[in-house]
Design a protein with these regions (language model features):
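Non-heme di-metal
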Residues: 22-201
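Short, Lys/Arg-enriched N-terminal segments with co-localized hydrophobic residues
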Residues: 1-21
């Protein structure tokens, strides 16, 4: 993790702790905080690498090795979560959506654009274009997180101002109305299992 990226992550942590009353990072400003950030980054990267390695092993016919890579990736995920919790990086859903939106904003407004400029200067125009294309995706991610956050802030997650088609994510039951039922009448799962149905096929 680069110094600049670490600095940006620290700023985001501070901003959201203040805004959403998240737990305080008792390690702030210490070498231990830097070590925790490095540990989180290292475990997160290892987890991703091992899932990629598992895909290769599976394609090559090594099912046991693929399973071991995936099992180890799950272990690394838990290690990363442990260090991220120590950094007080996990809040409630509202705080997490806001933090995610800020992270995506940094990626598309600063990080990928800076990476693209450097790639161009060093003679890698195709990579520069790819950095910018991924940056455009990160912009969409930010917009999605901000829309979801707005739904929570305006109490529009399970109730809309217009009639919608709601679908139970568990059993597929359909309800038409402005509000999802508090309990699915078919499978008895709670309202949290309902979403606005999207047909994109």
């Amino acid at each position: 993790m680069t110094y600049r990226l670490k600095k940006e992550i620290s700023k985001i942590f501070i901003l959201f702790k203040e805004e959403f009353n998240m737990a305080e990072n008792k390690y702030a400003g210490t070498q231990t905080e830097k070590n925790l950030q490095e540990a989180f980054a290292g475990e997160s990267q290892a987890r991703n690498k091992y899932t990629y390695f598992a895909s290769v092993a599976k394609k090559e016919g090594y099912e046991q090795m693929a399973a071991i890579f995936l099992k180890t990736a799950d272990n690394e995920k838990e290690h990363a979560k442990m260090w991220f919790k120590e950094l007080a990086g996990i809040g409630d859903t509202k705080a997490n959506l806001a933090a995610a939106a800020e992270g995506e904003n940094f990626e598309w407004t600063d990080m990928y654009e800076d990476f693209a400029k450097t790639a161009e200067e060093e003679g890698f125009p195709a990579l520069a274009a790819k950095f910018r294309m991924v940056g455009a995706i990160e912009k969409q991610h930010e917009e999605r997180y901000r829309a979801l956050l707005k739904n929570i802030e305006t109490a529009q997650v399970f109730e809309k101002s217009e009639v919608k088609v709601w679908e139970c994510r568990n059993c597929g039951h359909i309800v038409v109305g402005t509000k999802a039922p508090s309990v699915c009448p078919v499978c008895s799962h709670p309202q949290s299992y309902f979403e606005v149905r999207e047909e994109n096929y």
